[in-house]
Amino acid sequence: MSVMSGMDVIVIGAGVSGLTTAVAMSLAGRRVAIFAAEGPSQTTSALAAAIWHPFYQAPDLIYLSRARHTYGAMHRLSSDASSGVSMRPLTEYFRRDAGVPWWADCASGLCRVPPARVPSRFACAYRMDVPVAVTETYLRYLMNMFLELGGRFVPRRIEDPSALLDEVEIVVNCCGFGSRQFGDDALSLSRAVVLRATRDDAVQGCFIDDSDPFAPTYIVERDDDIVLGGTAEPDLTSTVIGQRQIDGIVRRCTRLCEGVAALRIIDARVGFRPVRHSPRVVRDERYARLLHNYGHGGGGFTLSWGCANDIVRLAGEVPSAA
């Protein structure tokens, strides 16, 4: 029997976008298989801080809709301890006071931080509650949900997504930067250096200052560790992390929360974000039954359920293969 017997959708890629898309398609009644060269733990998503936040995003109604959809979905998942998702207080600092963040109505518990509690280098700060995921746990949770819904995982590298249209009705490309080999020259890499530290009561909650596009500063408290970041270095592909860079990240994070100085660094990791001028969540121009969902940059988790929902809608508009 063919591995694709009874399947009508193939999702390529097993990062957060691929897994979420596969789950959403399965929940919509599709029979789905994931084809991926790597399992979830080997993907770029596995290295993410996995905090809901619109990093470096100009006001955009489509982005807002997708982020709002994801916020709601992950908020609901936070009630299931096995999901690895929890709601955490986030304080974001701003160098310029432009009023309430444009995306703020997505988040619950929003309030302006009293000026006396804002470091002098910042103009203002806002506090809100946001979803945060323990990446390994959450990705495994999504995979298990997918399999329980009748999905299949096939370890297979794909060279040409369109060739799979002979096997199933719909193919969804969620390959991230791997989509560049399929002809998307608009994709580029952004190198991200992140540190993991042991949990400590000196740091409670999450903190962000993303005013520097090349050096976003963030502290993300998770269930079993604290993530410190970071960098956004265009087109750098080296996996070497210098001590000076590690010290710089710790120093920047300490300016947001003094308790960081008490943390013990466990390890330093490098990931590569798939960056594009905007995420590509569309039907392919040449093949009507080939859909794309990639290029989210640092917003993979923030947009995951919203983009997956859009793919389900697009799939419903695809003409029959017959």
Language model regions located:
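Beta1/beta-strand and adjacent pyrophosphate-binding region of the FAD-binding site
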Residues: S5-G15
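Conserved FAD-binding subdomain of flavin-dependent enzymes
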Residues: A24-S86
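Short beta-strand to alpha-helix junction loop
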Residues: P59-H69, A125-Y141, V240-R244, T302-L303
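A conserved short coil-to-beta-strand element within the FAD-binding core of flavoproteins
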Residues: G151-L165
